[in-house]
Amino acid sequence: MRKSFILLFACICTLLASCSTEQTPTRADRIRTQLLTCDESSVIVVAHRADWRNFPENSLEAIQSSIDMGVDMLELDVQRTKDGVLMLMHDHNLDRMTNGSGDIAETTWEEFSKLNLKDHQGNLTEYKVPTLEQALLLCKDRIMINLDKADRYFDEVFALLDKTGTGNLIVMKGGQPAEQVKEKFGKYLDRVIYMPVVTINNAESEQAIQAFLDELKPVAFELCYSNAESPVPAKMKTTLKGRSLIWYNTLWASLCAGHHDDLAVEDQDGTYGYMIDTLGARILQTDRPQLMLEYLRSRKLHE
């Protein structure tokens, strides 16, 4: 009897140990799965340059604020210093965002470390310019990242992804035709999510989208349009249904035919709602992530 009890206890311990080693999907994993499975049950919110209204754009503090807010993905801009350090900044020079001046490509990381960031009103803050590696580690398991301007440094970016174990976080985008994408980035396409960016103001854009569907079968397309009379955006809702998610930008009027963030302050249904209901958007990039999240939650389109 005693031996049977010991054997049973050992089996239970083994079972519990095996269960504990099974990895629970992280928040980033869940968002990635939504992309890969073309799940249209909710809307993915992308914060443009992170939460730049409350902290300097592309800063660690803006990233953390976005995570706390419940944002799903960040758009972050990558530059490289004179001594080869990949860091976050939109502009190619220091003037607008720091208390320094000159080109980033002519500035060493040591020189960067002495600078402070400015907020969106030009006020100097105590916050520092982050490296890409710092940002990746902060985002790990917590939020997806769309790296902008990073295709110039693909090999170096991937070395950092391997080092930090964050390859599952990354979305890369570009405006090149499908054949060029395969030729230039082919060895990476099975490791990260790649989304084509297509301006859909004319019929030629439909051919470009079809080429991507045939060649790469992307999980999503970023679509831009400025002509409110164009029939193509509504047509894309049908064309891409069940095949690829649709990403639109509500940052300014020329990207979304006037259905932009500033108008959403007074009319979310006519802006965000229009992009979702009429055009089939399931990924929206915004400069007002808190406003967008509140609207989506009111419609049960976001957790």
Language-model features, listed with the residues they occupy:
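Bacterial Sec-dependent N-terminal signal peptides
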Residues: 1-28
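Phosphate-group recognition and catalysis centered on beta-loop-alpha active-site segments
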Residues: 19-303
